[in-house]
């Protein structure tokens, strides 16, 4: 997690927040816990809530976004680039940010770290905007993409709760209440 390059990005900007969330996703993949990361990594305090929201949202939709990337990108990009795509695709799916602003800020985040990939990221995100309904329907054909849980967990729940496994998986992914 030492390799966070956000030095040219304004902390109040969405590009900084996408970049930080992507770095956290990569670190989780390397075995770090989010609790540990949020405690140890310096994040601009004003940006912290949005970085956390982006990170948690991306993790909740990891199966779907990874499925889309693996389906629509012939050569899988490097981990951090994939993580930026996951953050951006999740937000486009949830429709919580202005779509074109989100695409622009994701491309700025990529340009700050991996400028060679900005055209690819821009193309993937814009393609999603054009083909959103088709991508969402395609995700429903894959259990990991549909339920956003690993296949081993889906199989375990199917075996232990053959009549209730789908509701169990579905109730596990929404955001928690703000209480």
Task: Describe each region flagged by the PLM.
Residues 1-179:
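Class I Rossmann-like S-adenosyl-L-methionine
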């Amino acid at each position: 997690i030492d390799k966070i390059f956000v030095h040219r990005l304004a902390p109040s900007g969405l590009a900084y927040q996408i970049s930080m969330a992507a770095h956290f996703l990569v670190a989780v993949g390397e075995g770090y816990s989010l609790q540990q990361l949020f405690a140890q990594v310096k994040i601009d305090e004003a940006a912290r809530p949005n970085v956390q929201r982006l990170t948690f949202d991306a993790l909740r939709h990891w199966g779907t976004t990874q499925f889309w990337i693996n389906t629509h990108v012939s050569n899988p990009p490097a981990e951090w680039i994939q993580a930026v795509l996951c953050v951006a695709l999740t937000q486009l799916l949830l429709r919580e940010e202005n779509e074109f602003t989100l695409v622009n800020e994701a491309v700025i985040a990529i340009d700050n770290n991996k400028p060679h990939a900005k055209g690819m990221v821009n193309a993937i995100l814009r393609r999603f905007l054009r083909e959103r309904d088709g991508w969402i329907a395609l995700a429903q054909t894959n259990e990991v993409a549909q339920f956003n849980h690993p296949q081993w967990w889906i199989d375990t729940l199917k075996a232990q709760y053959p009549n209730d496994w789908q509701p169990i998986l579905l109730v596990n992914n929404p955001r928690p209440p703000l209480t």
